[in-house]
Amino acid sequence: IDASQLDHRRLNEQIRHSPGTLRITGCLGQRFIGAGAERGRLEITGTPGNALGAYLDGACIEVRGNAQDAVGDTMNDGRIIVHGSIGDAAGYAMRGGEIYVQGDAGYRAGIHMKAYGDKVPALVIGGKAGSFLGEYQAGGIILVLGLSQTHRPIVSNFPCTGMYGGKLYLRSDGRGLRLPEQVDARPAGEDDLAEIGKYVENY
């Protein structure tokens, strides 16, 4: 599908009527791409707009480019892969599935993330994350690799604000990191490394 002349409604209508693997080119900020998709694969070139993969329920979305805000909003299952950076509030309230970001994430990534039943959502950020990472996190795994950072912190201000569950892994010595009192911070142990190993391998 050439999305360069389609608004988000027309584009999403075509997606819903095209099962299997679908390649989308010329993406220019169209919203809600893949929202609620249960199966199939979307391969996107360009920049999808807000709420990419919102309510995703099993499909796979891969983006060759950047993505805007709210990637994987309330995601339940499936996988989103972004070969670029993403905007704010990625993984908002996600309760299953996996999001992989090659570059950086904006503010409030992983806000309200939660685990549900046997589902453990995972958000993997290859670069750095903005302020309020893991805000009100209740479950799931956030992993920040900081591969693009050599001198600056890989997480900005106020990480884990209001966090009361889940795990946040940082490839960092933690110097200068200010965490709320309710958050237990420690070096990763063998069990931790085993837990995140599959996500690092997937990345």
Task: Identify the meaning behind each predicted range.
Residues I1-Y203:
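Long, distal/terminal scaffolding or interaction modules
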